[in-house]
Every structure is written in C-alpha cells, then in structure tokens.
Amino acid sequence: MAKDSTGRMRVTVKSAGRMKLSSKLWLERQLNDPYVAQAKRDGYRSRAAYKLLEIDDKHHFLKPGASVVDLGAAPGGWSQIAAKRVGATEGKGKVVAIDLLEMPEIVGVTFAQLDFLSPAAPEKLLAMIGGRVDVVMSDMAANTTGHRKTDQLRIVGLVEDAAAFACDVLKPGGTFVAKVFQSGADATLMTQLKRDFASVKHLKPQASRKDSSERYVLALGFRGPETTNWSNPPD
C-alpha cells in the first residue's frame, strides 16, 4: 500500500501472470474507489446507485407511488434505488427493469428481458405496467471502438434512442434521465429534448469519476406525446 495525494492509503496491484496493464489499472481503480466499497456495504449492485441518489436528492422525481422504467438496467443499481424511492418494495409504486441480459431478481422490480429498440417494445411495456409511466431512466453506455468520433456518435445515438422510447411511454409531466458524455455531438439531442420537455439540464454527480467525461441529462416536465417526432429532428 501507498498513500495518495490526499494522504489516504492506496492499494496497488502487482501484475500477476499475463494480466494486461489496462486490467491492472481497472482493478486498482476499483480497489481504491470509495463508492465501490460503500456499494458493497450498502448492498447496492453498482456504484452507479449513488449517482441516481444524488440526482434525485436534488430534483425529487422518484416520488412515492410513481411508475419507473430502467433501460439497460443490469446489474440493477438504479433499479434498487428506484424501487426504494417510489415504494415498490412495499407494493406502492412500480419499477420495470429492461435489459438484453438476464438480471437477478430485485425486490419490488419487474424484470423484462427484451430489446427496447424493438418497434414492439413500447406497447409491451405499456401493457406490462398498465399505462404510461412517470420516469424513464438510462445509465447505459454504448460499446466503444476506440475511435473517438465514432464512439461519441454511438453514445449520443443510444441516448437519442432511449429518449425516443421515453417519449413513447411517458405521461405528460414525466421525467427522462440518461447518461451522456461531454462532447459537441449532443447539440441535436439537447434541442430535441428542449422541444419535448419543459426543463433540460446537464449534471455531473459527485459519484462520477473526476477524470471521466460522463454527464447526465435530466429532462423534466414532458409536454406530451403529441409534441414528439424523433424520426424528424428539428433544425
């Protein structure tokens, strides 16, 4: 162990066998991340839970009795927070977690293994939850190629797809929150969201790593399905 610049003890990993440098650095970061350790103590499936906690503590959209959809939910950290905040663990609100991957059961959460990009997905969700929802959230990140511009476009494209899905299933007044990455590629996304929501802003929770370009977009006050047209973006 060694001390970092703040005086805290830092774990270093000695390379074992054929461990790649990138794997070694990732493991060191995990071992020295206070949010990773706290998530284990609190029983959350990922450190991302604290990002949603912070965003909701400031903006209060996960209200008791609300209905919530978590896109790309695995491993389930955001779904855990949503279930507690809306009362789904006590049979009050509703939380539906959607992912292509299987996800272990979470108390108060209904899991749907499906592709939200499927044309039939919005109708399946509406039938499952019994009507339009209050919140759609996404902590998804697109698979990267290593080519910066291509990756930026992929990331923004995924958020646009999530936003289009949200506009298909949200109630008027509803909320959309999603992970983005700081770049110049999201100008059209922000314009579209501002057309469809009363308030749109970028956020960077303290739980986001300081060296990451990760941000979250929070769109409040959905204007209603009649305003949306994600197949025809505004100029």
Curated annotation (Swiss-Prot):
One of its GO terms (cellular component) is cytoplasm. Keywords: Cytoplasm, Methyltransferase, rRNA processing, S-adenosyl-L-methionine, Transferase. Its EC number is 2.1.1.166. One of its GO terms (molecular function) is rRNA (uridine-2'-O-)-methyltransferase activity. CDD domains: AdoMet_MTases. The active site is at K179. It catalyses: uridine(2552) in 23S rRNA + S-adenosyl-L-methionine = 2'-O-methyluridine(2552) in 23S rRNA + S-adenosyl-L-homocysteine + H(+). It is found in: Cytoplasm. S-adenosyl-L-methionine binds at G76, W78, D99, D115, D139. It is an enzyme of class 2 (transferase). It comes from the Bacteria. The keyword Nuclease does not apply. Specifically methylates the uridine in position 2552 of 23S rRNA at the 2'-O position of the ribose in the fully assembled 50S ribosomal subunit. PANTHER family: RIBOSOMAL RNA METHYLTRANSFERASE, RRNA METHYLTRANSFERASE 2, MITOCHONDRIAL. Belongs to the class I-like SAM-binding methyltransferase superfamily. RNA methyltransferase RlmE family. HAMAP family: RNA_methyltr_E. This is Ribosomal RNA large subunit methyltransferase E. The gene is rlmE.
